Swiss-Prot record:
GO cellular component: plasma membrane
Principal localisation: membrane
Name this polypeptide is given: Potassium transporter 1
Pfam families: K_trans (PF02705), K_trans_C (PF22776)
Other information: Low-affinity activity is strongly inhibited by barium or cesium.
Cytoplasmic side: 1-19, 89-154, 211-219, 289-300, 362-392, 446-449, 496-712
Family classification: Belongs to the HAK/KUP transporter (TC 2.A.72.3) family.
Tissue specificity comment: Detected in the whole mature plant but preferentially expressed in roots and stems, and in potassium-starved plants.
Keyword entries, A-Z: Cell membrane, Ion transport, Membrane, Potassium, Potassium transport, Transmembrane, Transmembrane helix, Transport
């Protein structure tokens, strides 16, 4: 079955997918296997190996193996199936999922906007709906807390960014551990192959994966679902074979009693080993994050009726094999494969690792794009890799950065056990962030009773804290990697957000007053030249300081002036009919307008987007529908037509883009830490990141930059 581009586009660009036919749901469910479940399905490659990598030993009674499988089964059932499939997938934001979707819901319902240019008119967007106005005592109390303590809003943002940074850490560790685990199976057939060659092969595959990203996944995505399907069917069939051949009694380990027996007999070592068990649910967060690419029902169908049983059978079969082959624990996955099908399964495993890596890389591009929309990451070039499928993007800087980090981890560690320890900490951290945000969503958005909310957070939170504590114990053995990565990204995000916020505050404090503009008269104190001048700023009201700086140094300006503010709003997408908000600046004879251009946090301006024509059309429509005096209706209509003609003639004369090239500097009275953050770190990022003109796709032939210094 081939993937249908029209269905994928529908899955990505439309939020109301509940009316899909049964055939369409099944088609989307099949497609999701190659996009969502690549990471989750490759976990059997390293779960048992990592779990038994410490001091946990095997005894003849097999109580440890039965206990570990019991933990895997119930963790998979409670966290992946009950929490994510049955509960978390319901917390969508207009069909979109992920950490930012939860945060967006909270911001809208609790009015926690951290965007400095938020306007009341944004709340009238069709996707901004906040449901019924009714409040419960709990939801009102939480909202009141955030209103009375503004710093708590910043803390919530930092908490969300923490989860985001850990997710980025996942994107470094997933390709590394998946590819290296898959390739290491070759040593079983070629025992004399040196470990260095295995690492080199893994590095070559990783370089190949990142090198083809610029071409877009849509060119090869049609084979992703068949690969994942073949992989899941292979490992589940082998699992059934091993269960029947080696130890059918493993079925009894489905009882939770074996978890208790395991912890009782192994003690501290058993608790420490749980950091390996949690790797069985790596990738469950992807189900929620990629919700906007498919439908909630299709993801639930794919997981509940195919992915879940296939993986449980695979883990069961490997446990049955291990119960009779204690000495093969460090190569249990490949040792459990029957000899006649070893090489076919090895090849499929390698391709499955590539598919799993591709899924998290694409998800990282989406995460970084959303961070940029919230002013929480330096400007990067975002490229659409498909003209048909919305949401498939490529970010060159992030791609090569991830490749370098993956290669560094692969070459530096060379040990999938240490990688597993690092991976576990990243996974449990993201899950805990989701649980905490879901608790707030259940209180503020869903308005659930306090007993329901407490039951959710206590039950799932305690399970995840158990695994988290186990992973924290292994920080010296590889767990430091995601901590280092997340702290680095957190510092970058926070400093960038701090710097841009301070620059906006400077803009607000130093904007040019309308009295000054009006005092200049109709000519605005200068020669008006043909054409349209687009003055970009972050202000939604007032005249930006960059304009005052410009008119002070240049005695000419365009006949039509448009102050353009491109901003993000706390919804995933903004419809084209709602994108432009046009208003006048000053009297009509001045020919000055303001255009607020709104994008959702998942919207990305396309390279071929005809911005000029759409903007001019929006201005003309505004002029035509602008209310006038009834007694002068005829003359008003004539003046409107004349003004529209002037605007169109100005467009034909040419459009110039005026952007401020700003330099932020800390005030002399600032602390040493602030000077370091602003004058050194923020300045370095501003200098080396993409320019505003690149991000906004401004044509270089029409660009005019005005230098300004911001003292923050």
């Amino acid at each position: 079955m081939n993937q249908s581009p029209s269905l994928i586009e529908q899955g990505i660009s439309q939020q109301h997918l509940k009316t899909l036919s049964c055939a369409n749901v099944l088609t989307l469910a099949y497609q999701s296997l190659g996009v969502i479940y690549g990471d989750l399905s490759t976990s059997p490659l390293y779960v048992y190996k990592t779990t038994f990598s410490g001091k946990l030993s095997l005894h003849e009674d097999d109580e440890e193996i039965f206990g570990v499988f019991s933990f895997i089964f119930w963790t998979f059932t409670l966290i992946a199936l009950f929490k994510y499939v049955f509960i978390v997938l319901s917390a969508d934001d207009n069909g979109e999922g992920g950490t930012f979707a939860l945060y967006s819901l909270l911001c809208r319902y609790a009015k926690l906007s951290i965007l400095p240019n938020h306007q009341e008119m944004d709340e009238k967007l069709s996707t901004y709906a906040t449901g019924s106005p009714g409040e419960t005592r709990q939801s009102a109390a939480v909202k009141s807390f955030f209103e009375k303590h503004p710093k708590s809003q910043k803390c919530l943002l930092l908490f969300v960014l923490l989860g985001t940074c850990m997710a980025i850490g996942d994107s470094v560790l997933t390709p590394t551990i998946s590819v290296l685990s898959a390739v290491s199976g070759v040593k079983l057939k070629i025992p004399n192959l040196h470990e260095n060659y295995v690492v080199i092969i893994a590095c070559i595959i990783l370089v190949a994966i990142f090198s083809v990203q610029r071409y877009g996944t849509h060119r090869v995505a049609f084979i992703f679902a068949p690969i994942s399907t073949a992989w899941l069917l292979s490992i589940s069939s082998i699992g059934v074979y091993n269960t029947i051949k080696w130890n059918p009694r493993i079925v009894s380990a489905l009882s939770p009693v074996y978890m208790y027996k395991f912890l009782r007999s192994t003690g501290v070592e058993g608790w420490v080993s749980l950091g390996g068990v949690v790797l069985s649910i790596t990738g469950v967060e992807t189900m929620f994050a990629d919700l906007g690419h498919f439908s909630s029902l299709s993801i639930k169908v794919a997981f509940s009726f195919f992915v879940y049983p296939c993986l449980i059978l695979a883990y069961m079969g490997e446990a049955a094999f291990l119960s009779k082959h204690h000495e093969d624990i460090q190569q249990s996955f490949y040792k459990a494969i029957p000899e006649p099908v070893f090489w076919p399964v090895f090849i499929v495993a390698t391709f499955a690792a590539v598919v799993g890596s591709q899924a998290v890389i694409s998800a990282t591009f989406s995460i970084i794009s959303q961070c940029c929309a919230l002013d929480c990451f330096p400007r990067v070039k975002i490229i659409h890799t498909s003209s048909k499928i919305h949401g498939q993007i490529y970010i060159p800087e992030v791609n090569w950065m991830l490749m370098c980090l993956c290669l560094a981890v692969t070459i530096g560690l060379r040990d999938t056990n240490m990688m597993g320890h690092a991976y576990g900490l990243a996974v449990t951290s993201v899950m805990l962030v989701t649980t905490c945000l879901m608790t707030l969503v259940m209180t503020i958005v869903w308005k659930q009773r306090i007993i329901t909310v407490l039951a959710f957070v206590v039950f799932f939170g305690s399970i995840e804290l158990l695994y988290f504590s186990s992973c924290v114990y292994k920080v010296p053995e590889g767990g430091w990697i995601p901590i280092l990565l997340s702290l680095t990204f957190m510092a970058v995000m926070y400093i960038w957000n701090y710097g841009t916020t301070k620059k906006h505050e400077f803009d607000v404090e130093n904007k040019v007053s309308m009295d000054r503009i009006v005092s200049l008269g109709p000519s605005i104190g200068m020669v008006r030249v043909p054409g349209i001048g687009l003055v970009y700023s972050n202000l939604v009201t007032g005249v930006p300081a960059v304009f005052g700086h410009f008119v002070t140094n240049l005695p000419a300006f365009h006949k039509i002036l448009v102050f353009v503010c491109v901003k993000s709003v706390q919804v995933p997408y903004v419809g084209e009919e709602e994108r432009f908000v046009i208003s006048r600046v000053g009297p009509k004879e001045y020919g000055m307008f303001r255009s607020v251009v709104r994008y959702g946090y998942r919207d990305v301006p396309r390279e071929m987007y005809d911005f000029e024509s759409r903007l001019v059309s929006a201005i003309v429509e505004f002029v035509e529908t602008e209310p006038g005096l009834e007694e002068e209706e005829m003359s008003s209509v004539r003046r409107k037509k004349e003004e529209c003609m002037e605007i169109m003639e100005a467009k034909e004369a040419g459009v110039a883009y005026i952007l401020g090239h700003s330099y932020a500097k800390a005030k002399q009275s600032s602390s040493v830490l602030k000077k370091l953050a602003v004058n050194v770190v923020f300045a370095f990022m501003s200098t080396n990141c993409r320019g505003t003109d690149v991000v906004l796709n401004v044509p270089h032939t029409s660009l005019l930059e005005v230098g300004m210094v911001y003292y923050v």
